[in-house]
Amino acid sequence: MHPFRLPRRAAILGSGAALLAAPSLRAQGRFPDRPIRLLVPWAAGGTTDIQMRALAEAASRRLGQPVVVENRAGAGGVLAAQQLLNERPDGHVLAQLPISVFRHPQMAQRALFNPLEDFTYVIHVSGYLFGVVVRADAPWRTFAEFLDHAKANPGRLNYGTPGVGTSLHITMEQIAQMRGVEWVHVPFRGVAENMQALLGGQIEATADSSGWAELVQAGRLRLLVVWSAERAKRFPDVPTLRESGIDLVSASPYGLGGPKGMNPEHVRVLHDAFREAIFDPSHVAILDRFDMAPWHMPPAEYTAFARKQYAEEGEMIRRLGLRL
């Protein structure tokens, strides 16, 4: 028996056809083939905006296409997620998905999206350092004094956050319930507006991510408490909520997602590029600046985490009786 061989002419023609087809196939399968839009649901200049821009730049170098940040501030951080409902699932539009994405549909009278069905979870990125700050000339030097004042003056003390349904808002209301105090929530569109209102005297305190850090170090604000499990490295003298007698930890984990129905291969490419970007020294330096840390999860793990978060946040919302 002789092994089967193509006639020489047929072999040459077949090889030529394959060579001609190869570039076409490669071109058809190239991803991404244009800039990627990254929707950020917070105002420009805040902690998340700065960090997302560093992440986008690092990812751009790996994807071979620009990752362009577009700010969609307001509505407690859900406008970017809402925008995904109108986008094609071709992998060229992503959004930062903060924890409020799991809360708002369970607080609203009519949910505009279902976070368990309407998104593709690409990669989990990080979480925040949160804390409560007051002006440096405020009368409260500790969080205990702040709480005592609130309890003695129900409904008269106010605080600002980046929006309704954010981790800052939810945790402050948890604290109020646990300590039997009543205070007034003042929502803003982002950290910049929040800080301006505090410095200008329109509000008495701010609960926010560590965008306040430089103002604290400059002596313009006083940090009363942090919400992390351990004390912040940059502020070792400031106690945690647990050390202050309140058994809470809040870090507001978040990641990146796209519209539902994305091509799994596109998800893989995006995940791999952003995973490398998360640990890129230029991005890690920004995380360090805001006392944050890498918190990577791949798509399957992040999707399971999202389902768990949705259930836990719903239980808390019902317990606190929160509505939009």
Question: Which role does the model predict for each range below?
Answer:
Residues 43-45, 99-100, 135-140, 161-166, ...:
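Short coil/turn segments
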Residues 33-35, 177-181, 264-324:
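An extracytoplasmic/periplasmic, membrane-proximal ligand-sensing/linker region
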Residues 27-117, 156, 181-207, 215, ...:
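N-terminal (or domain-start) structured segment
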Residues 156-238:
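Ligand-binding pocket segment of bilobal, Venus flytrap-like solute-binding proteins
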Residues 86-92, 106-193, 253-286:
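Hinge/capping helix and adjacent helix->loop/strand transition within the periplasmic-binding protein
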Residues 212-279, 308-311:
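C-terminal lobe and pocket-closing loops
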Residues 21-24:
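N-terminal signal peptide c-region/cleavage motif recognized by signal peptidases
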Residues 1-17:
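N-terminal secretory signal peptides and thylakoid transit peptides that target proteins
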